[in-house]
Structure formats: C-alpha cells, structure tokens
C-alpha cells in the first residue's frame, strides 16, 4: 500500500472544495435536499476517488453473477461522450455516443439495457415506466455514489489497495471527490487490485485504516488477466513467437496493465495517456511511427491496448495501416473476490432484489 502523492500548494483550494462538499452532504443527510426512491432495486457501484479503482470490471463482475437470471439495466453518466441528454444504447452505439465504459459493457452484454444520462433520476424513471416484461429487475448505478439525488438500496464503494484512501486528500491537491469519512455511507466496501500474497496482517491493517462500522462488509478483489488477447480490428490471433509489443493505456492507473504486458512480452514501448483519452491525429501518427520502429526490429511485434482504450481506438480504425490493424489487440481484465467471499457478496445482492419484490 502506497501513500498518495499530495500537491501541497493546492491544499487551500481543497479546503474550499471540502466546505462545499460537506455542506451538500449535510443537506442530503438532513433531508433538505431530497434523494429519490424507486420501485426497482438499485445497486450503486462507485468511488470516493476520481478513478483508478477498476469500477467497470467490478460492474461487469456483478453482471456476470446475476445475468441472465435477472433482467439487469446499467445507468451511467456516459463520461466523455459527445452527445447530450438521455440515450438508450444499442449494439451500434460508439464510445462517442455513450462513452467508452458503457460501450464496453454493451459490447460484452448486448441484451442488457444500458442507458447514459447525466440526470440519473430521469433514466431510472424511464426504466420504471417500461412494460412489465421489459422492466429490469435490478438497476446497476455506475459511478453514482456522489449522485445523491438517487437513493440506492445498496451502496458498494471501491477503493484501491495501492492508494490508501485515508491518507489521500480532497481535490485538487489529491484525488478524493469527498472526504474519506464519506465511506461510512457505504453498505459494502471492496478493496481492489489486491496482490495475490495478501497476508492476514495486511487484512487487519486495511480494516483499521478504513475504520468501517460493524455493519459494513469489507471485501478484497484482485485483477485477473487470464484471458488471451482479443483482436481489435481483425480475427487473427497473435503468434506464439511474439516477444515485443507496443503497449497503449489511457486509464487512471495503468501500472498493473503494463506489468502484465511486460510479463508476456518483455520488449517494446509503453505509451501512457490520461483516463478516457481521445486520441488526436498527431498521437495516432506517433503510434504508427512507434509501430513501424518496433516492427523493423521484430517482424512478429504486436500492438496491445487496454479493453477500455479499445472502445475509443476502434473509432480510429481507418487511420491505422492495414498491417498494423492485423496485429492490434486488447487485453480483457476481470476481477475476482478473494478469500471465498463470493457467496456472501451474492447473498447480499439477492437480498436487495428479493426485498423489493
């Protein structure tokens, strides 16, 4: 567990930001500002930090556990999309239409209802008004912990094992959207990106640092890159002789991705971009140059990006030369709960669904 980097010069601005956040939370706690309740059970999967906890893989994990046993809908803001208002995703929706993360979910689960709307209450109201045979039995509110206008039946908060929440700082000096103590609003907390060799002393330290209430269940999850590479533009699988890769990541915390890539492909070039990055023409040209340079050294070299980046890079297909397209892959990631916690997790989810039947 690492101590977060704090920009001390921005602490005064963080103090002002904190006043506003605390006031807003106080008004919701005292019912001066109203949270809307709905007839359909709602599970919120959110963060207290501005990203990097693996939220989308955890949303997909929840879907895998309950789908197709239950009709599930996902409601998201659709961050960085180029559209406005409420959009019901289709299989043809792009990352520009609905955002890269909702696009990733819809691509994996095409029969799922995925809606993007900055006004999450409006989107949920739309789902509640659907005919009985279409109405979801569970709504997953993606990144909605701060969206307190919606009252979730279960709040799941994710926090990165490698970035200690209680030692972080409010924006803009740190990465906290609200004070670390806000985690006490959560029903369940998942400590994400845990190492395989997590020891009992580490578990006790995590519980102590988070200072959770007795009713708050703490779970531990790890990333799994066990799946093979998936072709982005073609149907060709990579050669077993590949030793070099141009690795591309535009996510909040790319460390685990690059570590996995370099374990599989020891040589190559790493390119890091901001989270949800929209690749410019110049950046695409530089990636093509990187590819040509690497390919001259190793004729079997490939290009690998994260699964989330694949949703955006797919929009630039025509910009890449054909030979590069044929060697362009993405690396899917899944999460798994550790210490045989899955049954407890599922039972809690089922309890929420059954409670509102």
UniProtKB/Swiss-Prot annotation:
GO molecular function, one term: ATP binding
Pathway: Glycolipid biosynthesis; lipid IV(A) biosynthesis; lipid IV(A) from (3R)-3-hydroxytetradecanoyl-[acyl-carrier-protein] and UDP-N-acetyl-alpha-D-glucosamine: step 6/6
Keywords for the protein's UniProt record, in alphabetical order: ATP-binding, Kinase, Lipid A biosynthesis, Lipid biosynthesis, Lipid metabolism, Nucleotide-binding, Transferase
GO biological processes: lipid A biosynthetic process; lipopolysaccharide core region biosynthetic process
Enzyme Commission number: 2.7.1.130
Binding site for ATP: 49-56
Keyword Transferase part of the UniProt annotation: yes
GO cellular component: plasma membrane
Family, per entry: Belongs to the LpxK family.
PANTHER family associated with the record: TETRAACYLDISACCHARIDE 4'-KINASE, TETRAACYLDISACCHARIDE 4'-KINASE, MITOCHONDRIAL-RELATED
Function: Transfers the gamma-phosphate of ATP to the 4'-position of a tetraacyldisaccharide 1-phosphate intermediate (termed DS-1-P) to form tetraacyldisaccharide 1,4'-bis-phosphate (lipid IVA).
Protein name: Tetraacyldisaccharide 4'-kinase
Biological source species: Porphyromonas gingivalis (strain ATCC 33277 / DSM 20709 / CIP 103683 / JCM 12257 / NCTC 11834 / 2561)
Gene name tied to this protein: lpxK
